[in-house]
């Protein structure tokens, strides 16, 4: 059901309504633009790109929009790094090289924090959550639960 709502898999029957609008056949990008966020169960398969930096993973859902991209489609790496640094501090993400740390080099708990920070920062209308605190320490679990709720 989670993959159907987020658009990762097509639904087999029925409809998915968001604020009365049928989103069943919409692309993942369109669902994101309508305000659907998704904290995935498998962070390494669907949640982030291990070869990308923290900054790139934070911007991945909106890389084509300002401030991450100009109207001509040129990426603004400074804006990406700035937002990532802000979220690294806010969510206590342990990233050795700050926003330029490769996501795959971080612990599973810190990878999870990157995903959670990205999704919460987007202020989604609907946040679909599967095991959001998996791999996190007790202090981080409490902080994340407060931010989600």
Residue ranges of each PLM-predicted region?
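Glycine-rich phosphate-binding loops of nucleotide-dependent enzymes
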Residues: 1-149
